[in-house]
Amino acid sequence: MSFYSHIARPAFFSLPPEKSQHLAEILLRQSLLWKATSKLFSFEDEVLHTELAGLKLRNPIGLAAGFDKDIQFLSSMEQLGFGYVIGGTITKEPRSGNPSPRLLRIRKEKSLINSMGFPGEGLQAAAKRLENLPVDPSAIRIVSISGTTIDDMVTCQTTIQTLCSAIEVNISSPNTAGLRIFQEQTHLLKLLEALNQNKKVPIFVKLPPFIDSQDKSMTTEIRDLIEACLKSEVDAITVANTIPVEDTRLAVGKGGLSGSKLFENTLSMINTIKSEYGTKIEVNACGGVSTGEQAYQLIQAGANSIQLYTSLVYEGPGLVKDIKTDLAKLLKSQ
């Protein structure tokens, strides 16, 4: 990570956020480069082996949705040593997303605020890229889907599910108009009923956050969503999406906060859910993780897997290996 922190990151951060993101994507699309350097990021230990919704993982560290929105470099991300990778979020039709500026850095807090609004090339382009990915029987590839109607969600599911290991249903982006309809229990139940009729692979549901500094309790709305997931036999929930914030520097005036500032909230949410629901549902922890110690705390709290995004931007491609190395030591010492 020294090269990244002293050379690569300053170069990326000298550019506006979206321009540096585009540059990173160009580099990540060089799949042969990442395959050739994969040994630099390799760390395997049986103590990290686990299962998630029946899927056998080499380790519990996953790439969160949003990093590779259009399935352009998932095979490169797999070379970094993730236990699984999530592509998307994919929508049925192409979307331009929200107007710019729509991505901000908060360097002191190693955080980001985004109001992207699901920009992407749409379902058919993503499906074609999934079909063309190198065959790897050990790879766990998950796809995040979203939409504002049940029909759109089902179309995404039925098109994608034969090409991936599981589907994560995003009902919780704070940046997409119309999506909040599925944050109502009745509508979520109808959505999950429709998805279950066509289900061939595990389904995860990505929930909105429910804890802030003023209220350390689960809200009625979130409890209703979890109950809907349990009733519909969802295979796992992802806790949680970005925290909604307002910021006048964004064109739309609001967005979602991600990064290190979220870790304590994430840990509190996992503790709260597990204390109430125990082993009734599997949980992916997402938000603020950048160290093996933090991953260990979440696993001890009951998380089945850990998802990374913003910490990769700040710490670089060696982060996954560092987290796994420290996590393995902690698991062996318990």
Would you name each region that the model predicts?
Residues Y84-E93, I171-N175, A236-I243, V289, ...:
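Glycine-rich phosphate-binding active-site loops on the catalytic face of alpha/beta enzymes
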Residues G54-G62, D136-V143, N198-I211, I273-A285:
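Short beta-strand/loop segments at the ligand-binding rim of alpha/beta enzyme cores
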Residues P94-K110, E246-G259, T310-Q334:
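C-terminal helical cap(s) of enzyme catalytic domains, especially alpha/beta-barrels
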Residues L74, L123, A127-E131, M153-Q161, ...:
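Generic structural signal for well-ordered alpha-helices
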Residues R29-Q30, W34-F43, L112-S115, P174-H187, ...:
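Glycine/Thr-rich beta-alpha phosphate-binding loop at enzyme active sites
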Residues I61-A65, V85-G87, N114, R141-I145, ...:
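Hydrophobic faces of well-ordered beta-strands that scaffold small-molecule active sites
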